Design a protein with these regions (language model features):
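Juxtamembrane and boundary regions of transmembrane helices in multi-pass small-molecule transporters
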Residues: 31, 96-128, 133-189
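Transmembrane alpha-helix interface/packing and boundary motifs in multi-pass membrane proteins
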Residues: 66-75, 109-121, 204-210
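Flexible hinge motifs at transmembrane-helix junctions and intramembrane kinks/re-entrant loops
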Residues: 1, 13, 163, 188-192, ...
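Hydrophobic alpha-helical transmembrane segments
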Residues: 22-23, 57-65, 79, 105-106, ...
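Structural signal for the C-terminal ends of transmembrane alpha-helices
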Residues: 34-39, 90-92, 167-171, 207, ...
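Interfacial loop-to-helix junctions that mark the boundaries of transmembrane helices
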Residues: 8-21, 139-152, 184-189, 206-218
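Hydrophobic alpha-helical membrane segments of integral membrane proteins
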Residues: 1, 75-83, 118-122, 214-221
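Membrane-embedded alpha-helical segments and adjacent helix-loop junctions characteristic
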Residues: 2-98
């Protein structure tokens, strides 16, 4: 058969697996997986949605905000699947003909896509854009710098989506009860470890310009912590 020698050095092939963007997403994915595994996502959803009360318009805003927030650190698909599970029982309580349930249902894909813009790990194209800007134009954009510029845009788009959805699909229901089930997963020291690792990683990502620690290096923290403590396996 034909020899493949000289086509590409194996070190170049292997180096692609250690690409900074790949490491950044591995860190983000590990945080998202652990958040779901130990019920952090359910706990956060309960806490964050509670202040929005029972007014349907405010509940819609609450879902838009929470979904966007989760989508900044989790995949859009995982976020949508999780929030749909929370929203399905609520949609079932709507009277027939109430267009408001369409607004709530659409809040999931709309907000998940908007939220993904907010951080470099929100969606793969963001990381690719950062990598290409540095490679071809010499522009280095940190996690914090991206977030500072894009989160205000996300907030504006959330407000626009909130208004548009209400206008197109007005609520006739006057009160909505949001009952998200409690986290039924046992709380262990690993649960607190995941919380702490999540907080420290996000903090270091947001303060890269102050600490001087690259976001790609910070992404190794959750990977190292979860592997060394066996958290992935438990």
């Amino acid at each position: 058969g034909a020899k493949l020698e000289g086509i590409m050095n194996y070190t170049k092939i292997m180096s692609a697996f250690a690409d900074p963007v790949v490491m950044l997403f591995l860190g983000g994915f590990s945080l998202a997986i652990m958040a779901q595994k130990y019920g952090l996502d359910v706990t956060l959803a309960r806490v964050l949605l509670k202040p929005f009360g029972t007014n349907p318009k405010m509940v819609l805003l609450g879902f838009l905000v929470v979904i966007a927030l989760f989508s900044m650190f989790m995949s859009n698909t995982a976020t949508a699947a999780m929030m749909l599970a929370f929203l399905a029982p609520i949609l079932a309580t709507f009277p027939e003909g109430d267009k408001g349930k369409i607004a709530l249902a659409l809040s999931i894909p709309v907000s998940a896509n908007i939220g993904g813009i907010g951080t470099t790990i929100g969606t793969p194209p963001n990381g690719t854009a950062v990598s290409n800007l540095e490679t071809y134009f010499g522009m280095s954009i940190s996690f914090g710098e991206w977030a500072i510029h894009m989160i205000p845009f996300v907030l504006i788009m959330i407000l626009v989506a909130w208004v548009v959805l209400q206008v197109m699909f007005p609520f006739s229901t006057k009160k909505l009860e949001v009952n998200i089930p409690k986290n039924d997963k046992p709380t262990t020291w690993r649960t607190y470890l995941v919380w702490a690792t999540f907080a420290v990683t996000i903090l270091l990502w947001a303060t890269e310009s102050l600490t001087g620690i690259s976001s790609n290096i910070v992404a190794l923290i959750p990977l190292a912590v979860f592997v060394c403590t066996g958290t992935f396996d438990k």
